[in-house]
């Protein structure tokens, strides 16, 4: 019996020694592999995570809310792990401006995510990790082409620019469609029609073409945009835990399907443009890019050429950014209008006073409609429908606010936290457009500049300016003619659904009443 106890004691001692040895070895390996923090700097703080999973469960279904809560505890620069991947999370307007603007070259990278490789075969200008001179030159080219066929003067039109012409046409269609639906059904889901009209605006700029609202090929693409947002939103687990890519995943399957359909749709349109291209007769953005491609020149400082594939990739980026963001902005705007009827009345009173009913609103009216602008800003701020920027990564070893961040580190930028910071806004949960107006009724430009939605710095949204103009003009034209409500007894659900863009539940009980006769001319 004593020999048995002795054996047990021996085994226990052996196991204990083995455990100590393994622990010490593991500790040594971790210390050896861990990036050495330069003297005077610190590693960003953060909570302890679970083995293998890291902080996946902490993020939950609403990562923007979870990380905002953590920022209150750990500060504007904190670190989490998703799987085994460390992620630095930035909050606070000053901190984010420091990173993306003042230290923009340090933070302009993109992480090499699996989901990003599925977008335009991994060659997307927006999602690709590349951020060198070739990328910068292509981005400038895309910006110039977008500007040329949006806010540049259209000599063949009475409108001030191409964008104004296209939006007026689509807004007029929506008004007549809503009126018809009211006469036939008595209520409708505005998103069903908004998404196609907004898509038609970017189609006109890219391809010089307008699609029917019942075009099945177009509908199959735009109706899958929610799946795109689910996968590309910050914190998508399969990007950080590779084994999850091989498990059944309906969102990932839909994402792959969407990208194939989207690329095929763009490829067909671009090929048709190549077939009908005439040098000197540039019809749209695609023609403009083809011309650059055939000239074999991109930028005098970048020794690269624009291949045929790159033309498609740039168009995919412009097209993708051009319909989802604007559609989401207008959709949220309508939700706020029906839940804040007093705000809607004030906007319409301003439109009647400044413009009247004898003509449509135009882009040149924007500076004279401060309350409408304040409403749009408050919609951007309160909804924060782009809660994070597309994830960034560091391009070199750097420091921020005294914290060391090594090269290649994934960085989340929490825009939602800025827009709901109580110190900045006082009552961030209240929807109050008046906060953006001065005592004299003009737009408060300083406060307006603190609303953060489209990113900052070298990776900011390429279509921000055009998107803002488009949202303004759509809303101005619609609200001049129509009053939006919901069917009596029905309520709208404004609970955000997380993704790259925050969505709300669809509402099929919208109503649109043609406004009673008002002043035909601006009031004195």
Curated annotation (Swiss-Prot):
EC number of the protein: 1.14.14.1, 4.2.1.152
Residue positions with a glycan: 71
Chain positions covered by the region annotation Mitochondrial targeting signal: 33-44
Keyword entries, A-Z: Cytoplasm, Endoplasmic reticulum, Glycoprotein, Heme, Iron, Lipid biosynthesis, Lipid metabolism, Lyase, Membrane, Metal-binding, Microsome, Mitochondrion, Mitochondrion inner membrane, Monooxygenase, Oxidoreductase, Steroid biosynthesis
Domain of life: Eukaryota
GO BP terms, alphabetized: estrogen metabolic process; fatty acid metabolic process; hormone biosynthetic process; progesterone metabolic process; retinol metabolic process; steroid biosynthetic process
Alphabetical list of CDD domains matching this protein: CYP1A (cd20676)
Pfam families the UniProt entry points to: p450 (PF00067)
Induction comment: By 3-methylcholanthrene (3MC).
GO cellular component: endoplasmic reticulum membrane; mitochondrial inner membrane
Pathways involved: Steroid hormone biosynthesis; Lipid metabolism; fatty acid metabolism; Cofactor metabolism; retinol metabolism
Catalytic activity, reaction form: an organic molecule + reduced [NADPH--hemoprotein reductase] + O2 = an alcohol + oxidized [NADPH--hemoprotein reductase] + H2O + H(+); estrone + reduced [NADPH--hemoprotein reductase] + O2 = 2-hydroxyestrone + oxidized [NADPH--hemoprotein reductase] + H2O + H(+); estrone + reduced [NADPH--hemoprotein reductase] + O2 = 4-hydroxyestrone + oxidized [NADPH--hemoprotein reductase] + H2O + H(+); estrone + reduced [NADPH--hemoprotein reductase] + O2 = 6alpha-hydroxyestrone + oxidized [NADPH--hemoprotein reductase] + H2O + H(+)
Transmembrane domains' residue ranges: none
Gene3D superfamilies xref list: Cytochrome P450 (1.10.630.10)
Residues at which heme binds: 461
InterPro entries hit by this protein: Cyt_P450 (IPR001128), Cyt_P450_CS (IPR017972), Cyt_P450_E_grp-I (IPR002401), Cyt_P450_E_grp-I_CYP1 (IPR008066), Cyt_P450_sf (IPR036396)
Positions of substrate binding: 228
Family note: Belongs to the cytochrome P450 family.
Name the record gives this protein: Cytochrome P450 1A1
Origin species: Mesocricetus auratus (Golden hamster)
Lineage: Eukaryota, Metazoa, Chordata, Craniata, Vertebrata
């Amino acid at each position: 019996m004593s020999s048995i106890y002795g054996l047990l004691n021996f085994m226990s001692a052996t196991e204990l020694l083995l455990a100590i040895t393994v622990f010490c070895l593991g500790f040594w390996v971790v210390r050896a592999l861990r990036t050495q923090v330069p003297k005077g700097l610190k590693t960003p703080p953060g909570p302890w995570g679970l083995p293998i999973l890291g902080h996946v469960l902490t993020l939950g279904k609403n990562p923007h809310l979870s990380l905002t809560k953590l920022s209150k505890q750990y500060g504007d620069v904190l670190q989490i792990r998703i799987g085994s991947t460390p992620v630095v999370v930035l909050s606070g307007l000053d901190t984010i401006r420091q990173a993306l603007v003042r230290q923009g070259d340090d933070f302009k990278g993109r992480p090499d995510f699996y989901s990003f490789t599925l977008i335009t075969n991994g060659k997307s200008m927006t999602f690709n990790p590349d951020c060198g001179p070739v990328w910068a030159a292509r981005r400038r080219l895309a910006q110039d082409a977008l500007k040329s066929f949006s806010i540049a003067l259209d000599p063949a039109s009475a409108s001030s620019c191409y964008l104004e012409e296209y939006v007026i046409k689509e807004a007029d269609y929506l008004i007549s469609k809503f009126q018809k639906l009211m006469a036939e059904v008595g209520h409708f889901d505005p998103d069903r029609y908004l998404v196609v009209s907004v898509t038609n605006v970017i189609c006109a700029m890219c391809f010089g073409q307008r699609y029917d609202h019942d075009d099945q090929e177009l509908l199959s693409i735009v109706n899958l945009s929610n799946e795109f947002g689910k996968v590309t939103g910050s914190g998508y687990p399969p990007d950080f835990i590779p084994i999850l890519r091989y498990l059944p995943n309906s969102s990932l399957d839909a994402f792959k399907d969407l990208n194939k359909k989207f690329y095929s749709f763009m490829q067909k349109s671009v090929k048709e443009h190549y077939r009908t291209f005439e040098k000197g007769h540039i019809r749209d953005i695609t023609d403009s890019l083809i011309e650059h491609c055939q000239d074999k020149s991109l930028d005098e400082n970048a020794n690269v050429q624009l291949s045929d594939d790159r033309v498609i990739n740039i168009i995919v980026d412009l097209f993708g950014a051009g319909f989802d963001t604007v559609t989401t902005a207008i959709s949220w705007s309508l939700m706020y209008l029906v839940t804040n009827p007093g705000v809607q009345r004030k906007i319409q009173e301003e439109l009647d006073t400044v413009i009247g009913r004898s003509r449509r609103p135009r882009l040149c009216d924007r500076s004279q409609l401060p309350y409408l602008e304040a409403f749009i800003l408050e919609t951007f701020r309160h909804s924060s429908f782009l809660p994070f920027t597309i994830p960034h990564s560091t391009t070199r070893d750097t420091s921020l606010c005294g914290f060391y961040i090594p090269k290649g580190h994934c960085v989340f930028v929490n825009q939602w936290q800025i827009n709901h910071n109580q110190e900045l806004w006082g009552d961030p949960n209240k929807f109050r457009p008046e906060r953006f107006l001065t005592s004299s009724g003009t737009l408060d430009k300083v406060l307006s500049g603190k609303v953060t939605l489209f990113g900052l710095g070298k990776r900011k949204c390429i279509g921000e300016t055009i998107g803002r103009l488009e949202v303004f003009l759509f809303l101005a034209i619609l609200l001049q003619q129509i009053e939006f409500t919901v069917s009596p007894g029905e309520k709208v659900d404004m609970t955000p659904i997380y993704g790259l863009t925050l969505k709300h539940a669809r509402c099929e009980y919208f109503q649109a009443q043609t406004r009673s006769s008002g002043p035909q001319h601006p009031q004195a």
